[in-house]
């Protein structure tokens, strides 16, 4: 068996085309969707992510504004800026690029964004809606992963899913989305005993642990669907996932590559969600 590649670049292009059409319709009503990204400090990876978001947004007709603040900015100043953006009627989505410097409380800052402009889907109210299966903004990476299942006709209902990683950005919201779609979900993490025994039970294995090429074929059931959320650099400086692609693609039925898998889908979902927030603001929701 050689795994079918779940092509995030191809699928994200399809989604971006749809987003672009929706932007055109909004502009006919005099509304330009606007996304504001706040970047604190000079983290090189964060700068690349922000640049990619801006470039993608502009290509789709979304107004994207970067606000760059120095590393030593006071938390109060950042909070004041978010308050201003919350009350600005022309802004539809607000995103604070993580990580933030140590002296700033990430939760306090991200929770300050009002739920109606929480384009990342991290506000406790939106997370609560997710767990109660009420529509609202969703964390972009889990939402992008669900799009793979839809596009490639991969059934989720009744399937056993193992998620390795319990972060608030991927693991936990991913579990909620899957439960809402009638999957049976296990979350594994660094304290899980006999990890391979757990992961080998998975019909769908989602890996988000930040350890380069950690998962090999010994962790994967034959015919499983494998979603690799990891982004790591190996010793040669090459971008790799948390899954050993060469090894696992021999046993999996489907697999996402790194790069070109989950990454492009996350940005596509961010754009889609920005436009959805603009649509909701027009509808007065």
Curated annotation (Swiss-Prot):
Coiled coil: none annotated. SUPFAM superfamilies: Aminoacid dehydrogenase-like, N-terminal domain, NAD(P)-binding Rossmann-fold domains. One of its GO terms (cellular component) is cytosol. Pfam families: THF_DHG_CYH, THF_DHG_CYH_C. GO terms for molecular function: methenyltetrahydrofolate cyclohydrolase activity; methylenetetrahydrofolate dehydrogenase (NADP+) activity. CDD domains: NAD_bind_m-THF_DH_Cyclohyd. It catalyses: (6R)-5,10-methylene-5,6,7,8-tetrahydrofolate + NADP(+) = (6R)-5,10-methenyltetrahydrofolate + NADPH; (6R)-5,10-methenyltetrahydrofolate + H2O = (6R)-10-formyltetrahydrofolate + H(+). InterPro entries: Aminoacid_DH-like_N_sf, NAD(P)-bd_dom_sf, THF_DH/CycHdrlase, THF_DH/CycHdrlase_cat_dom, THF_DH/CycHdrlase_CS, THF_DH/CycHdrlase_NAD-bd_dom. Pathway: One-carbon metabolism; tetrahydrofolate interconversion. Keywords: Amino-acid biosynthesis, Histidine biosynthesis, Hydrolase, Methionine biosynthesis, Multifunctional enzyme, NADP, One-carbon metabolism, Oxidoreductase, Purine biosynthesis. Its EC number is 1.5.1.5, 3.5.4.9. NADP(+) binds at residues 165-167, 190. One of its GO terms (biological process) is tetrahydrofolate interconversion. Homodimer. Catalyzes the oxidation of 5,10-methylenetetrahydrofolate to 5,10-methenyltetrahydrofolate and then the hydrolysis of 5,10-methenyltetrahydrofolate to 10-formyltetrahydrofolate. NCBIfam families: PRK10792.1, PRK14186.1. Belongs to the tetrahydrofolate dehydrogenase/cyclohydrolase family. This is Bifunctional protein FolD. It comes from Ligilactobacillus salivarius (strain UCC118). The gene is folD.
């Amino acid at each position: 068996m050689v795994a079918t590649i779940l092509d995030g670049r191809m699928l994200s292009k399809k989604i971006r085309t749809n987003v672009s059409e929706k932007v055109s319709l909004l502009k006919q009503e005099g509304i330009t969707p606007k996304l504001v990204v706040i970047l604190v400090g000079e983290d090189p990876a964060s700068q690349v992510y922000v640049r990619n978001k801006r470039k993608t947004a502009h290509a789709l007709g979304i107004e994207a504004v970067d606000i760059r603040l120095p590393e030593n900015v006071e938390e109060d100043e950042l909070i004041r800026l978010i308050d201003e953006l919350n009350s600005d009627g022309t802004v539809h989505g607000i995103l604070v690029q993580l990580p933030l410097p140590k002296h700033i409380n990430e939760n306090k800052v991200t929770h300050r964004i009002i739920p109606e402009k929480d384009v990342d889907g991290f506000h406790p109210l939106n997370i609560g809606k997710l767990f109660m299966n009420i529509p609202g903004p969703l964390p972009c990476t889990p939402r992008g992963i669900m799009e793979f299942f839809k596009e490639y006709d991969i059934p989720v209902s009744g399937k056993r899913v193992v998620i390795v990683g319990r972060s608030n950005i991927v693991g936990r919201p991913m579990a909620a989305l899957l439960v809402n779609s009638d999957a049976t979900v296990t979350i594994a993490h660094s304290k899980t005993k006999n990890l391979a025994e757990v992961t080998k039970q998975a019909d769908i294995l989602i890996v988000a642990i930040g350890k380069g090429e950690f998962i090999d074929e010994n962790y994967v059931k034959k015919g499983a669907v494998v979603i690799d959320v990891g982004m790591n650099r190996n010793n040669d400086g090459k971008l790799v996932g948390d899954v050993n692609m060469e090894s696992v693609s021999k046993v999996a039925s489907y697999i996402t590559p790194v790069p070109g898998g989950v990454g492009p889908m996350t940005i596509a979902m961010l754009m889609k969600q920005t436009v959805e927030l603009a649509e909701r603001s027009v509808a007065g929701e």
